[in-house]
Amino acid sequence: MMQESGTETKSNGSAIQNGSSGGNHLLECGSLREGRSNGETPAVDVGTADLAHVQQQQQALQVARQLLLQQQQQQQVSGLKSPKRNDKQPALQVPVSVAMMTPQVITPQQMQQILQQQVLSPQQLQVLLQQQQALMLQQQQLQEFYKKQQEQLQLQLLQQHAGKQPKEQQQVATQQLAFQQQLLQMQQLQQQHLLSLQRQGLLTIQPGQPALPLQPLTQGMIPTELQQLWKEVTSAHTTEETTGNNHSSLDLTTTCVSSSAPSKTSLIMNPHASTNGQLSVHTPKRESLSHEEHPHSHPLYGHGVCKWPGCEAVCEDFQSFLKHLNSEHALDDRSTAQCRVQMQVVQQLELQLAKDKERLQAMMTHLHVKSTEPKTAPQPLNLVSSVTLSKSASEASPQSLPHTPTTPTAPITPATQGPSVITTTSMHTVGPIRRRYSDKYNVPISSDIAQNQEFYKNAEVRPPFTYASLIRQAILESPEKQLTLNEIYNWFTRMFAYFRRNAATWKNAVRHNLSLHKCFVRVENVKGAVWTVDEVEFQKRRPQKISGNPSLIKNMQTSHAYCTPLNAALQASMAENSIPLYTTASMGNPTLGNLASAIREELNGAMEHTNSNESDSSPGRSPLQAVHPVHVKEEPLDPEEAEGPLSLVTTANHSPDFDHDRDYEDEPVNEDME
């Protein structure tokens, strides 16, 4: 009997030392904090209240252990003195689970394996936190109950030595059995919790595994810190505020550190991927690629340079970059401050992006609504219905203009007999078109430059004027109304920041305009060659000279602002509807070409075919026609576009905006001309 008692006592002692059901995190926190204080310097200070609470819990558990050891020693001594009572000792022994007394330590290597297997989502963290808190409450209640039972058992043992009745011994035995059942239930709950963690791929620790010595915690994580992280998840409004604490429970929640949870290996343990919480901010989704699969890809490494903000250290290879990252950008106050600054930068950029998107949406909405407002015009004498025009355009190519509503304007046809001609619709054209609104909308160049002088001087924005208009303005602003070529160059660079670069291109264009336009006259004087402006000749080369009915002129000017060329789809629809003068075949027909020439003569449209106007970068032709006796003076076609005869207006395919906006730096063919 004595041998059996001794054997069971040893088994109980071994069970106390080697049991492995869940761990007491409070005791573990105390022991690990002691190890941290004795060994490594702690990465983060712990509050005095938390430390005092942990020390109290540790002392209470140590006292409980001492009481158990004393009880076992007393039982052994009593067993030696009174061998008759040894048969009753097994019923009075209280098996204690290591789950209640010995903490289960999760080493950094094990936590790394856990995180590589699966990354918890915020919802899973919430569930695990609730389970952990419930287990902690049950564990504390069980510890208190265990202490009370130990005291009662000690009293009962004293009474038993005094010679009590067998009924009381049976009651003690039943209480002992009930207590054992509660301990077993607690063990089962903890085992189920561990099994659930294993099923979720979060825990791969074998039972009875001894705790390894504490290692540096700058790249590790202990269960107590994980528990603290879970508590912060419940207290925070968003789960993003706490994921940056995972290196060594660094408290960055006050500055909303968020971003160490996107990838599978980027939470805590992997120094190659975590980079002190400096991954993509506010991205809760998981990334399928890990740095183990692609060892040479890293957000902070590119082209042999460290991309850490403010670093830009040159690293020969990826391994040297990792060494540099772990040495120079370890978890310290400087790296933490840089991380906070980067977060603020990202937040400001996101805010600015949201504002710019809202502004862009408002601009698009405004322009869309404005373009759909129809412009009124006098009732024409003979025209194709604008409704039919818009309908045919939409039927011909429903996808060609998805966001460009058409606004047909009323065309103007001559009073003489001839084929009906329609005007173009207001559609947004696609292409490198620069609008010269000073010429189209009758905005004087002098007033525009005066109003936006500071803007043009500081912003590298191309001025919305032709080179000829700018040269004329430069000459007119001079006191003597004449400038040398170098003085014209200086005026361009002084007035516009845009011309302070690419000097070879625009200076070549200026020389071409001076040489090829008749309105610019070269005069020889004592200073050398100077350039002046022939104002009469300059006014001749303007796109339109309209005289006649004032109301008609007003309507034409209003409609001019909304006229753009037809696209290919609209031309095809007109060809199907047999609309003359707008199909490619009809344009190539000599009979229709002669008819168009006769119509132009009846309208007194004078065409200027000069070398000056062939190279002109001034505003192009207007697609509007004039009613007799309105006189329309128009620019000629460019050489590459003068293949077919003109229609009543100019040509069917002609884009007034495009030719009007054409400048010499866009035509390298002419740049060799002097």
Curated annotation (Swiss-Prot):
For molecular function, the Gene Ontology terms on record are: DNA-binding transcription repressor activity, RNA polymerase II-specific; RNA polymerase II cis-regulatory region sequence-specific DNA binding; zinc ion binding
Region labeled Disordered — which residues?
1-44, 269-296, 388-427, 608-674
* Species in which this protein is naturally found: Bos taurus
Could you tell me the Gene Ontology terms of the biological process aspect for this record? Answer: animal organ development; negative regulation of DNA-templated transcription; regulation of transcription by RNA polymerase II
| The keyword Signal is annotated on this UniProt entry | no
**Region annotation (CTBP1-binding) ranges:** 380-384
Q: What is the lineage of its organism?
A: Eukaryota, Metazoa, Chordata, Craniata, Vertebrata
Record-linked InterPro entries: FH_FOXP1_P2, Fork_head_dom, FOXP, FOXP-CC, TF_fork_head_CS_2, WH-like_DNA-bd_sf, WH_DNA-bd_sf
Crosslink position(s): Glycyl lysine isopeptide (Lys-Gly) (interchain with G-Cter in SUMO2): K285, K370, K375, K440
GO CC field: nucleus
State the name under which the record lists this protein: Forkhead box protein P1
Predominant subcellular localization, coarse grouping: nucleus
Listed under subunit, the entry gives: Forms homodimers and heterodimers with FOXP2 and FOXP4. Dimerization is required for DNA-binding. Self-associates. Interacts with CTBP1. Interacts with NCOR2 and AR. Interacts with FOXP2. Interacts with TBR1. Interacts with AURKA; this interaction facilitates the phosphorylation of FOXP1, which suppresses the expression of FBXL7. Interacts with ZMYM2.
